[in-house]
Amino acid sequence: MIDTIKVNNKTIPWLYVERGFEIPSFNYVLKTENVDGRSGSIYKGRRLESYSFDIPLVVRNDYLSHNGFKTHDDVLNELVKFFNYEEQVKLQFKSKDWYWNAYFEGPIKLHKEFAIPVKFTIKVVLTDPYKYSVTGYKNTAISDQVSVVNSGTADTPLIVEARAIKPSSYFMITKNDEDYFMVGDDEVTKEVKDYMPPVYHSEFRDFKGWTKMITEDIPSNDLGGKVGGDFVISNLGEGYKATNFSDAKGWVGAGAKRGLPKAMTDFQITYKCIVEQKGKGAGRTAQHIYDSDGKLLASIGYENKYHDRKIGHIVVTLYNQKGDPKKIYDYQNKPIMYNLDRIVVYMRLRRVGNKFSIKTWKFDHIKDPDRRKPIDMDEKEWIDGGKFYQRPASIIAIYSAKYNGYKWMEMNGLGSFNTEILPKPKGARDVIIQKGDLVKIDMQAKSVVINEEPMLSEKSFGSNYFNVDSGYSELIIQPENVFDTTVKWQDRYL
């Protein structure tokens, strides 16, 4: 049977695997030790190692093949596009229902004078020596128990998604009374109280409660500008997109404002946005925080100020009673972000007393649409020694803008999460998971996020990420009657 290979589910119609190729598997390597005066050696164990091998490939190159007769350079250029990845890719034989996570290594050698057919080899490097089923599986917990059937020949990692139907101080999942993973604190001797009650949490799916900003421009050098534009619902109904920009010079955009249900002395405010940076352009989007007198207290936002470069940065600025700005945070994207087409950016500002804490993180929205693997994370603290920035937070505004006369890098707000922080007695258990929060645990990536915020710092010291063995496993969820839990996995083979 003629077979071909798929790379990230893509194929080349004139490329085939040469007959007779032997698929390598079960790459166990034994460790032994020689002992003086003793025949043979002592068995010390075995391990599954990474390995590499060549796949022999054939190019069909005649007038009846796809696209007809092809030159040396035609073929080479297509092959380079097909195999040129810096990261792992899914490598699958079209006839098989499993794939490897593979890297490719050169060179590609093609005869200068093309023959019919054209033969060459590509080197495959497997740092992950397992095969994974193309089909994924999932099961939902019933009465806080969920079964997993791994039909493969090797243990396999899990993805756990748990939606809270009640507030909780922890989430725990255990396997057959052997292994467990926990985030939070379950110590029963500690008092449990919600010391961080939500004041206003909202995904941007409608404009209920928001007022359009028509004349009140935002006096922030990094994140402000002129208002007057409109917001429309965008990003599949999940974001505010600015439209109808004014003809004024400089930064022009759309703004919307609302009062909070209550003023917050100590608070945690998170703003998330999506940045469309496939094309170059200048843009900014931010959440602005005001005191009860309507004066700016703080601004948190994302900006790309270069119309011909993709060098975004996150800025946090505070304002005293007179309106004088104090920039306390300016974090430029790491180079790994420059080549991403669409990113989701989170920025969080926390104030407790005179200490301000900033935490920022991002997701590659194309490769990680479920937002399980945060990237480019950063944290910083800043002390308000003179206590110039202690006014309560009472009003918030969302603003997105472009620089008139230049191409716009579209940036849309996705959500605003405003939480009050109450005094917490020493040793008390905090409710780190609110009703409606989604806990995501990726056992293979070794990541845990709650409502898309990295929460590895909350992982219980004694717990660990675990795999499920080949065959049947029973998982238990705790606390009881608090979470709707789904477990996802793939069969894995040696």
Which residues does each predicted region cover?
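Short, aromatic/His-centered strand-loop micro-motif at the edge of beta-sheets
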Residues: V315-Y346
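Broad, structure-driven detector of short, well-ordered beta-strand segments within folded domains
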Residues: L296-Y306, V345-R351, S394-Y399, V439-D442
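Secretory/extracellular carbohydrate-interaction modules
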Residues: F207-D324, M409-N412
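Short, hydrophobic/proline-enriched secondary-structure or compact coil segments at domain edges
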Residues: L158-A162, Y240, I269-Y271, A282-D291, ...
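Flexible glycan-contacting loops in extracellular carbohydrate-active proteins
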Residues: P369-N412, N467
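Extracellular/virion structural assembly segments
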Residues: M1-Y200, A263, E276-L297, F417-L494
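Extracellular/lumenal carbohydrate-interaction signature centered on repeated Trp-anchored short motifs
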Residues: K257-I269, P335-I343, F466-V468
